[in-house]
Amino acid sequence: MAADRTAAGTAVRRRQCRGGVRRQRTHVLSSATAGGPHPRNLIGMTVSIPTTPNTRLQGKRCLITAAGAGIGRESALACARAGAHVIATDIDAAALQALAAESDAITTQLLDVTDAAAITALVAAHGPFDVLFNCAGYVHQGSILDCDEPAWRRSFSINVDAMYYTCKAVLPGMLERGRGSIINMSSVASSIKGVPNRFVYGVTKAAVIGLSKAIAADYVAQGVRCNAICPGTIKTPSLGQRVQALGGDEQAVWKSFTDRQPMGRLGDPREIAQLVVYLASDESSFTTGQTHIIDGGWSN
């Protein structure tokens, strides 16, 4: 997951490609490729993820944060393939340019998710939205004794306060039209399953679940749904960066991740993106206030 600060409100030129989203082959995911440099494959499993254009989100406008890489990027592409027009935000201008080149259904904009005024301005310029996917997040590693006050404040600013700002900004437009789907990124780590050295991260992700359930309860009668996604360990660029930052034997770290997974592999961002499309679509119209665990059986 991408996170934290940018020069708010600076637009990135949208690149066009012929025919909307570029057609891609079905992506086949094997346990060896998804789990890092660890060859163990407990069940010989492959996952076929379709990438052909469809109409599941036809006519919907989606706002996605942290769309420059990982889960956010794959979700933006998946929503665009499903017929949505996507406003994709991030703090990385180069990543947004690369994303915009993939689809003419994606408009990109730099955004600091901790800047409430910038979020309000973005929604005023590009809204109203049918779908909000809050993907931005920050992972602090350590126990309560390792978490000083600045780390505590930063974690809440990015992981919780930013969702408060975005939800509050998009809700009036959703309520006015009597429809909307808000999808908030939580985590299995600590909020669902106790995980060592994820103290403040887990606290914030538990708060995301509470935020999501409260919004769902308040606006269910007005046609607005709100759900939380709780992934397990997903092989994203940010996870790779955290592994590198630990130093030491990187292969041993990757092995520790896959060893705790009953499926013998890590998740792929494209698998999470498929859940995002489902929750964004009318297929999930009877689903709200739920925590959707997608962790390969880790928390079972």
UniProtKB/Swiss-Prot annotation:
InterPro entries, sorted: NAD(P)-bd_dom_sf, Sc_DH/Rdtase_CS, SDR_fam, SDR_superfamily_enzyme
Top EC group: oxidoreductase
Keywords, comma-separated and alphabetical: NAD, Oxidoreductase, Phosphoprotein
Location of the active site: 201
EC number: 1.1.1.-
Gene3D superfamilies membership: NAD(P)-binding Rossmann-like Domain
GO molecular function per UniProt: oxidoreductase activity
Residue sites binding substrate per the record: 198, 242, 260
Cross-referenced PROSITE patterns: ADH_SHORT (PS00061)
Binding locations of NAD(+): 63-90, 112, 205, 234-238
Family classification: Belongs to the short-chain dehydrogenases/reductases (SDR) family.
PANTHER family assigned: DEHYDROGENASE_REDUCTASE SDR FAMILY MEMBER 6 (PTHR43477:SF4), DIHYDROANTICAPSIN 7-DEHYDROGENASE (PTHR43477)
Role: Plays a role in the catabolism of L-fucose. Catalyzes the NAD(+)-dependent oxidation of 2-keo-3-deoxy-L-fuconate to 2,4-diketo-3-deoxy-L-fuconate.
Name of protein: 2-keto-3-deoxy-L-fuconate dehydrogenase
Source lineage: Bacteria, Pseudomonadati, Pseudomonadota, Gammaproteobacteria, Lysobacterales
